[in-house]
Amino acid sequence: MISKRDLTIYSPIIISGILIILFIYYIFSGTVRPSIDDIWVINLERDTDKLQHVIKQQYRFPVKINRWNGTYGKDEDRTTADKDGVHFMLSRSENAEENNRSNKILSKPGEIGCWLSHKRLLRDLYKMNVPPNYGHLILEDDIVVQTDFSEKWNKIRKSIPTDWDIVYLGINKMVGDRLNEHVFRWRNDKSPGNFGTHAYLVRHRSLKHILEKLRFMTAPIDVQFYNMLGDLNIYIIDPPLITVNADLESSIDKQQKRVV
């Protein structure tokens, strides 16, 4: 049985030990190279062909691909979208009669559906009980993955700075500063660029900050990232490891024609 005298002697030592452990964890938890710990592909229920297109590439990845049910903008109620940050002014028609006939999204349903899909997935990932350095790879369903992806990724990840918040494994019209042979530091300036959200890795501990920036929709998801995430440590792999299949029609383009 532990006496009061023992507690008096050893308590400061135990407390000091715990504080040292926490300090070491705090210092070194941020010095971890990016890793792909889970993979999520955003896919609409109706796009079964695109899902099969992604599944056929499963063998190129180190872990299993999970499917996230994407939001089909044309089927989304404006009221529900508003609760998730899409103001009525963005989703309603300029025609009052059309708005009275339908409560569905009537303006740019593809862009809004895409934005909601990414935000809802990120919000769900944020709720997961995983380590802070856990890496979530988010994909869209029109991707093309290099056949030697794992080999290249395992090599390139070692050259990505440990302060990473997001790593783009593919992007369009890159804007960045070269760090080494394969990695660029994302740069925000007046020139448009860094388009596309078809393949990006998110550090779990960064999700809270990202979601704060996505509280309200201000632009298509990739443009909003570019406009609002400049204070994060974002890196781009170039040449890309994952690209977009131009032969597959974009889900955004399919929905963009307004239907009432």
Where are these regions (language model features)?
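Short, low-complexity, Lys/Arg-enriched N-terminal segments of secretory-pathway carbohydrate enzymes
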Residues: M1-T8
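An acidic/histidine-cluster motif and surrounding catalytic segment
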Residues: Y10-L139, I143-V260
